[in-house]
Design a protein with these regions (language model features):
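A short His-aromatic
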Residues: 18, 73-74
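Class I SAM-dependent methyltransferase SAM/SAH-binding core
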Residues: 2, 12-57
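Class I SAM-dependent methyltransferase "Motif I" SAM/SAH-binding loop
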Residues: 5-9
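A short beta-strand submotif of the Rossmann-like class I SAM-dependent methyltransferase core
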Residues: 68-71
Length: 172
């Protein structure tokens, strides 16, 4: 299992502890976060996980599952990254994407939590994406239509919402 954009590795460490017979690789381009993740794995005594400083288009593998947890909307070239992930999947592999909850239209997202997500997105997510190659600038309220377009453009034949909470949507 690859966890791309893992940051300090909380999601990767959680999965590795829950599934000791599986192997996990946390991937992030931020070196200090990867150092923290490796230290945490050592402290927890987890031998089925490792963390690597890599970009979202440079890691290598043949993965059954590639995860993107709350990070795809921050990436400058989400289509290129989704295409690359597809090239690293095993024969029956899947991508799991978790993104902030958003309704299908901007008008529906202005109140409540959607308004907060727009605020965070304006000051962090969108500038982060725009500073990278391609700079698509999707932001935290891209929603299902935005994410579906990324995976359609990347050549995936299937994209579906599999679960949701008030704060996140899970796609496969």
């Amino acid at each position: 299992v690859a966890d791309v954009g893992c940051g300090a590795g909380l999601s990767t460490l959680t999965m590795a502890a829950a599934f000791p017979d599986s192997t996990f690789v946390g991937i992030d381009f931020h070196g200090p976060s990867i150092e923290m993740a490796n230290a945490a794995a050592e402290e927890k005594g987890l031998s089925n996980v490792r963390f690597e400083v890599e970009s979202a288009t440079s890691y290598q593998g043949n993965y059954d599952l590639i995860c993107f947890f709350d990070c795809m909307h921050d990436m400058g070239d989400p289509v290129g990254i989704a295409q690359y992930a597809k090239s690293q999947l095993g024969e029956n592999g899947s991508v799991m994407l978790i993104e902030p909850f958003a309704f299908d239209s901007r008008q529906e997202n202005h109140a409540g939590l959607g308004g907060a997500f727009y605020g965070f997105s304006s000051f962090f997510c969108t500038p982060c994406s725009l500073s990278q190659d391609v700079g698509r600038g999707m932001g935290a309220q891209a929603g299902e239509p935005g994410m579906r377009s990324v995976f359609d453009e990347a050549g995936y034949g299937n994209f579906q919402r599999i679960s949701e909470t008030p704060t996140n949507i899970v796609y496969e």
